[in-house]
Design a protein with these regions (language model features):
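A short, conserved alpha-helix within the catalytic core of class I
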Residues: 110-121
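Class I SAM-dependent methyltransferase Rossmann-like catalytic core
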Residues: 7-26
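C-terminal alpha-helical "lid/dimerization" subdomain adjacent to the S-adenosyl-L-methionine
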Residues: 132-176, 182-185
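Conserved class I S-adenosyl-L-methionine
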Residues: 40-48
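Hydrophobic adenine-recognition pocket in adenosine-nucleotide-binding enzymes
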Residues: 106
Length: 201
């Protein structure tokens, strides 16, 4: 399956993300970094070019492992001093354990049934799961051209993704965790919603 051009280069990836998020681009990473204490261990699912690590977590001595289907991104992460693994997270396999298991802007890849991957994250987390997911998306635009552009630009090599979350559908999905949810809040000018879910036990 053809990979979107933005997943072929960290520079292109970042240019598109800056265009999408504008002045909120940097703050979306800071919001997640602020949830992770120094010297914690982190597993980041669908980590992309791992900018969260290189710009925010490396300086906090966080033990970071990024998982992604894109070998180029994983190689770049390893060169930057993190640990990385190339893997297809759609396979039903246990995730590496860590204090914090997180995913930013990638849960939609697992639609129409995203609960199993969240369950695997909960099973791997010693402290908390952090999920940040876009709830305002190009693919839900009323313009067919913009919607198509959103699907094409967000294919990491697993096929075009037509399904996306709204705030309501994300809330509904994660409501099954009830009192395990420590908090939820919007970031990036309301474009993404963050859920912090406590580990079991």
């Amino acid at each position: 399956l053809a990979t979107s051009i933005i997943y072929k280069s960290t520079l292109l990836y970042e240019l598109v993300m800056v265009a999408l998020y504008g002045r909120h681009y940097a703050s979306r990473y800071r919001a997640i970094a602020d949830l992770i204490p120094a010297r914690a261990s982190v597993v980041d699912l669908c980590c992309g070019p791992a900018l969260l690590f290189s710009r925010h977590l490396r300086g906090k001595n966080v033990r970071y492992t990024g998982l992604d289907v894109n070998a180029g991104f994983v190689e770049g992460l390893i060169r930057a001093g993190g640990a990385g693994q190339v893997c297809d997270l759609r396979k039903d396999e246990p995730l590496p354990p860590a204090d914090y298991v997180m995913m930013q802007a990638s849960l939609y890849h697992f639609l129409p049934d995203a609960l199993p991957i969240v369950g695997r994250m909960i099973a791997a987390a010693r402290r908390q799961v952090i999920i940040a997911e876009p709830v305002r998306n190009l693919t839900t635009s009323g313009s067919p051209l913009l919607a198509k552009l959103g699907r094409v630009l967000t294919n990491p090599g697993m096929g075009e993704q037509s399904h996306r979350f709204t705030e309501e559908s994300l809330d509904e999905l994660l409501s099954v965790y009830g009192s395990q949810v420590e908090k939820s809040f919007l970031i990036a000018g309301g474009r993404e919603k963050v859920y912090v879910i406590n580990a079991v036990g």
